[in-house]
């Protein structure tokens, strides 16, 4: 059975997300998109932009599959000096700020229905401890309760920080009995840390969707699948062997949009590789 072909609008993150970009995504083979909620791209606080996109989705075949929650609260991806949003922030005020911003973005599901919300649980440098584990339980329980009436499933993503390593994500979800929370497997981070096979084996049935892109195991390059050294046949086989094979979301770097003539072919080829 063919997988849904989902393209992340992260590819266009340096541009305002408008209906023309969504139309292009459909022409290039995407059946659905993941909306990347960076405010310079998709301003979830703008009634006008949300209404414009909602109207387009209602009248077109391309659907909104998921949303990537905000990583920064500013409109410059942190370049203004704004720190990353962090649900495990040492200060209570920082945790509240992160939760409020993520909830603001999630509320757009009332107008643009989507299935999953991908969330960064921690920031680089965060350490695994009883304190961060408790903050994680509290944050995800709250997010799950907020998401349920919206029809959204929050997904935590494996990152490069200790609390977001695969084994710790599983511990958080299972000890906390957080059955309403899933995992988005970030293949690039897995390849840079524990290895893709190990990440899939550890996260197993918690994986609901995958962020698919490539690298060489050192930098988070967001290359087209096949342009790095991830073993794609083995990866696809391992994911397909799960009881519920996850959705594959193509998430290439915005730098690759600087070669627009290549985009249609590269996107179609990537979807074919991902199955």
Residue map of PLM features:
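Active-site acidic/histidine proton-transfer and metal-coordination neighborhood
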Residues: 19, 74-182, 192
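Flexible, glycine- and charge-enriched loops at secondary-structure boundaries
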Residues: 43-46, 50, 88-95, 126-133, ...
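Conserved beta-strand positions in the central sheet of alpha/beta enzyme cores
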Residues: 34, 66, 118, 155, ...
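Active-site-proximal loop/turn and secondary-structure-junction residues that shape catalytic pockets
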Residues: 11-13, 37-39, 70-73, 121-125, ...
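Histidine-acidic metal/acid-base catalytic patches
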Residues: 1-6, 15-29, 58-59, 113, ...
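N-terminal pre-domain/capping segments
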Residues: 1-104, 110, 148, 178, ...
């Amino acid at each position: 059975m063919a997988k849904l072909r989902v393209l992340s609008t992260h590819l266009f993150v340096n541009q305002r997300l408008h209906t023309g970009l969504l139309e292009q995504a459909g022409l290039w083979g995407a059946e659905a998109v993941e909306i990347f909620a960076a405010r310079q791209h998709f301003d979830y606080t703008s009634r006008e932009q949300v209404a414009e996109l909602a109207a387009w989705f209602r009248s077109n075949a391309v659907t909104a599959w998921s949303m990537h929650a905000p990583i920064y609260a500013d409109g410059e991806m942190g370049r203004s000096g704004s720190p990353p949003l962090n649900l495990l922030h040492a200060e209570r005020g920082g945790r509240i700020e992160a939760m409020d911003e993520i909830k603001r973005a999630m509320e757009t599901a009332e107008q643009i229905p989507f299935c999953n919300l991908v969330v960064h649980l921690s920031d680089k440098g965060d350490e695994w401890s009883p304190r961060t584990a408790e903050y994680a339980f509290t944050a995800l329980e709250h997010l799950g309760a907020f998401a349920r009436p919206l029809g959204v499933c929050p997904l935590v993503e494996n990152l490069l920080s200790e609390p977001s390593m695969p084994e710790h994500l599983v511990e958080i979800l299972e000890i906390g009995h957080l059955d309403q929370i899933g995992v988005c497997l970030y293949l690039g981070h897995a390849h840079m840390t524990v290895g893709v096979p190990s990440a899939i084996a550890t996260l197993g049935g918690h994986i609901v969707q995958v962020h698919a892109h490539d690298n060489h195991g050192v930098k988070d390059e967001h290359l087209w699948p096949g342009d790095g050294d991830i073993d794609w046949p083995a990866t696809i086989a391992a994911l397909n062997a799960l009881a519920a094979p996850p959705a594959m979301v193509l998430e290439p770097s915005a730098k690759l949009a600087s070669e627009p003539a290549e985009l249609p072919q590269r996107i179609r080829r990537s979807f074919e590789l991902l199955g």
